[in-house]
Amino acid sequence: MSSSDIFDVLNIKQKSSSPNAASPSVPASGKSSKPQLTGMQRELYNLLGENEAPVVVQSMNRFKEKLASNAKPTPWSLANFKANEYLTLQHWVKGSRELIGEEPQESEFKKYDVHLTIPEFTEDEYNSFIPTSNAEENEKQNIGEKVEANGDSTDVNMTEEDTNDKVKESVPQDENKSTSDNKKNNEKWEYNEVKYLFDLCKKYDLRWFVIQDRYDYENSNRTLEDLKSKFYEVSKCYFKAKKPDDPMLQSLNYSKDKETQRKKYLERLLARSAAEIAEEEALIIESRKFEMAAKKTLAERETLLRLLDSPQSDISVAQYLTSNGMSQLYNSLLADKSRKRKIDSAVPENPWMKQQHQFAQQRQQMQQLQQKKLEKHDASATPGPATTVTATETSTNVTSAGSIPSGLQSPKKTKRQKLELQTALKRKSESEYAEQLLKIFNMDERKSLGVIAHGEKLSPGVFLRSAKITTFKPAIQNKIISTAQELGIPARPVMPTFEVVTEYEALLKKIATLLDIKKQIDKIEAGKQITK
């Protein structure tokens, strides 16, 4: 479909009245010929009509422009170089032949061809430092034999059964010693073989598997461990003869028995069957389960110990019964929720260590009291100048008691314990002050009149004593009420006097602790049944 067809469909008149008047072969003189466009199909280009194409992508294949430089090119020449003492190679070098010269140069990469420093020695040197090491080993063996002989002489007074048992045990030991001696005799090394081993180590840079593969000295069957042990033994003797106090001698220790045992263990590990591997994996999973259960029980035990050791809260609930108190409680809870919690990573206190510290404190206090009593008795028995002596003794005792470690005097207390101690001291002082005011009343008069010395600050206004009974969480509260009903105790005391309310609160707290202990015991028994 051409552009004229589209104009006919859309009823658009073309600008030229006679389109076929001008022949396509004769171009107009005034108009320039359009360049032939590539990258677009002819039919699509004809649809554009007289309008020009917006953007036409034309592929222009161009090579990189030639670098215009007037510099003279540097010559390169093929020169010889020494790869090693026995091999000469060629490579291209920047520069002319006159500058390089005809003699082969050393390679630039020779500095990277680094080898290990293996000790070298002659036969005389080898015979000089090897017998000294053998003599030291013989002396150690003689000392061990003497110690064993002394031990045998001390054990003369033994029964016949013990001697028979020792003889039975010594027989395999003697057999093992004889086999080891035979092995040592069979493993004798000469200088030529040692020199051959050190040459291989120097050639292959202590690559032991390659050394064992290339090792072929008079058809000797040496294992990898034999080669290693001999190499490190001779190296240690060599460096020890040169510098006996060298701290690096410990790095040349090599245990052949441990290495063979390690390889045996590894072979046994790799030779396991699929059933054995599955059984081991099952055992590992079970052990991890036991570890997780043990950690969980330890955490629960710690929480239980904290619960038993922590003091019971005596805060009254009456301040939260009003609307103002409820709003304050709501705001404090919101602030507490928005505050970031610090992770308490401290190790929990061990109750047994705490008890031991308390026992140590009590023991020290008892000793101090006994010393004071003795000093008083001595002072009453010897009046006069002896009193000065007792005073000095008491001062020395006080100083000695003060020099006791702080860990035994008083264990470290947390912030919470310090605050509780401060509040307890404050209440005690307030109660003592109230007792001073109520000295004029007897106990009977106090009971009859209902006069009580409160240690804590009371909330203003009139309130019921039964409203001040401490409450617990809903789940715990329901359990406490059900246990109290089983025991025949009402949910609220009938006559809520001061003494009845205090005893009732103590009873509720005891029931709560017993319920928590029962819960922990049930968990422990369930864990025991699972382990069985």
Swiss-Prot record:
Positions of the UniProt region annotated as Disordered: 13-39, 132-184, 363-417
Residue ranges occupied by any SANT domain in the UniProt entry: 181-235
Compositional bias of kind Basic and acidic residues: 137-149, 164-184
A GO biological process held by the record: chromosome organization
Segments of skewed composition (Polar residues): 30-39, 402-411
Localization per Swiss-Prot or TrEMBL: Nucleus
Bias (Low complexity): 16-29, 380-401
An annotated GO cellular component: Swr1 complex
Database matches in Gene3D superfamilies: Homeodomain-like
Keyword Metal-binding: no
Residues spanning the membrane: none
Record key words, sorted: Activator, Chromatin regulator, DNA damage, DNA repair, Nucleus, Transcription, Transcription regulation
SUPFAM superfamilies noted in UniProt: Homeodomain-like
InterPro entries recorded: DAMP1_SANT-like, Homeodomain-like_sf, Swc4/Dmap1
GO molecular function, one term: transcription corepressor activity
Subunit structure: Component of the SWR1 chromatin-remodeling complex and of the NuA4 histone acetyltransferase complex.
Main function: Component of the SWR1 complex which mediates the ATP-dependent exchange of histone H2A for the H2A variant HZT1 leading to transcriptional regulation of selected genes by chromatin remodeling. Component of the NuA4 histone acetyltransferase complex which is involved in transcriptional activation of selected genes principally by acetylation of nucleosomal histone H4 and H2A. The NuA4 complex is also involved in DNA repair.
Family: Belongs to the SWC4 family.
Protein name in the entry: SWR1-complex protein 4
Source organism of the structure: Candida glabrata (strain ATCC 2001 / BCRC 20586 / JCM 3761 / NBRC 0622 / NRRL Y-65 / CBS 138)
Source taxonomy: Eukaryota, Fungi, Dikarya, Ascomycota, Saccharomycotina
Gene of this entry: SWC4
